[in-house]
């Protein structure tokens, strides 16, 4: 059982979100990675430098399972780099999952431009020495700039306090407090110094020279992308495998262990001249299973990912079908008004398939949750990359359709015609009448209808109108909200 969660992020000035320049073709934005053994405060430092709680922080070893990354851009200080939080590198006797985690972390080290090696003021272990030896010996790492930071130094440290670290052969160490934000400005200055000759420097200066500089707190950059796509679903439905299939390499840790992904992972992708930000979320669990603080944070982050997304892929496990909790996910997507489509993963594992198998699957699905009748659905295999490209084509199509705007005159004409077709068939009272309607948003497709009697518009009539709107304006997968208001004075 995890210990009680610590409130590790000190209150600071509000994050100012600004538009970061899109990188020029062929230009590389430098990468800075935080490394160290488990439980030295890597995720806390990551969050503190970003000034937002993106990584899960918990006084419990091994919380970070994936490499998290976020771009830090601050024009007036000539800062532009990707900051990465890596898993602890001191896993003993790793199983297959842990081995994959380690391989991902070590690959990240080799791809980094600057490394921040984090140590704990209160304890130096054999694992620290082992990691230090690796950094010194590994060919693809040894020549990289390394900043040695001693964390949890909440009070001033003199040379005597740091003597044990100097005995490790470190010529210079920087005492910091990730929680208290002590010396983080100095750490950023050191990072900036080592990045001076790295790729991207010329590009940063070129952009800076053309823009007016304004004093701002360190911002979290907003990337130049078309839309944000989130992948959600039950644990072990194959979300990380799908992310990897889309990216074309192992961006997230993949395992058959449910809930491998604890953090939400953002990946910026380019398809031709189109860009999207892809988010792989922690598996949503029933609330009763999120008692531990770690699972609670993962659940909350998944909800937040849905709220901040423009489009969602709801991933199902072909063998497990559409369960009660999948219904909760779909209801949540409807409630939040998010355009979404269904991807039935692991379709290759279904045996004895015929031409009717998919049709029968959809009929069974629609009988359990009729609202899914108007949602695009596709079968895929993430591990075999089966129909993954078609899934992305559907996603781009849905993104384009989610901005559908209809003129007020056309809406009024069509809705009044449909109301005339309905007549009294949907109401035992006088015929329901619509006097006027207007569209107030595109995603969800939200209409306000001024009517004679709100109570005359029963659920069956509302469903009829939604169906006509979906068919007429190609709104499959886009939630429709009809808000009825009485026009009576």
Curated annotation (Swiss-Prot):
InterPro entries recorded: G_ENGA (IPR031166), GTP-bd (IPR006073), GTPase_Der (IPR016484), KH_dom-like (IPR032859), KH_dom-like_a/b (IPR015946), P-loop_NTPase (IPR027417), Small_GTP-bd (IPR005225)
Binding site for GTP 1: 36-43, 85-89, 151-154
Domain of life: Bacteria
All copies of domain EngA-type G, residue ranges: 30-199, 227-403
Pfam families recorded: KH_dom-like, MMR_HSR1
Boundaries of every KH-like domain copy: 404-488
The keyword Ion transport belongs to this UniProt entry's keyword annotation: no
Keyword Repeat: yes
Name of the featured protein: GTPase Der
